[in-house]
Amino acid sequence: MTVLSQFIYYAYEKGDITMHVRSFQLSDVNSVTELMQIALSEECYKETVGAFARQLSWDSGLIVVAEEEGEIVGALIGTIDQNHGCYYRIAIHPDHRRMGIGKSLVESMEQRFQQRKVSRIWVAGDKHNSAAMPLYEAMGYGASQILQAFQKLSILAPH
C-alpha cells in the first residue's frame, strides 16, 4: 500500500495484470454506471443508481474503484451518516470476481472511514448484498455490524 497525498492507493500484480484501487474520479462516472449495470441485478441497479448520484454530489471521496489495465472492474460506494461509516454497495465485474478485488476495495474504504474518525462501521444488509456478506464476514464484520434498517440512510432519500 502506498499513500499518495490524501488518496489511498492499493496495487497488486497477478502475472501480467496489475490492479489498483483508487479514489473515484468524475471521468469514471460512465464506467462505474456500466459496471453496476453488468454486476448488479436490474432491481438492485435501480435502487443503487440514485444513492450513487447523491453520494457523488456529497462526497465522492467515499467511492472507490478497482482498475485493471485501464478498465474499472470494481466499485464500492460508502457513506457516512451520523458519524457512522457504511459500506453501501459493492459491484465487481463477473469476470473478475474471487480475485481479491472486493477485499481491496473494503480495505481502502475502511481506511477512509478510520481517517474520518467514524464511531462505527456498518455493512448495509439487504437482499441485494447477500452475495457479498461472506466477504464482509471474512473481513471481521459479523452480524452485529450488519445494518438491516439502513433504509434511513441519507443517501437513499433525497432531502
Located regions from the model:
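Conserved N-terminal entry element of GNAT/NAT acetyltransferase domains
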Residues: 2-27, 156-159
